[in-house]
């Protein structure tokens, strides 16, 4: 069972060195989700980057729906709420990657 952080707890909670999440220690699930997110970025976001500057809200809505269908929006949501239940670290990994091309997606993603 995953130990979920509550709210902004990660900002003030004391962290042990062995609990720090580094790329060299990604599990297979994290690698798979990262690869899926990178594919999503290249296939769906990169080709339409210039449209973000035009404030195309329908585009952002469409992309967020597609991200949701892939499970990218529910990575760290517990399974009992129909998320993937992969935990905080995996959620942050996906957030970092999906936000890497444009701040608009970073803002929409949360």
State what each model feature region is.
Residues 1-29:
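Intrinsic disorder at enzyme termini
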Residues 36, 62-63, 93:
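Short Gly/charged-rich anion-binding patches and loops
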Residues 39-47, 66, 70, 97:
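Generic non-transmembrane alpha-helical segments
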Residues 27, 52-54, 84:
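A generic secondary-structure micro-motif detector
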Residues 69-110:
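Internal helix-loop-helix
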Residues 48-69:
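Short secondary-structure junction/hinge motifs that connect adjacent elements
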Residues 28-43:
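A non-catalytic, amphipathic alpha-helix used as a structural packing/dimerization or gating element
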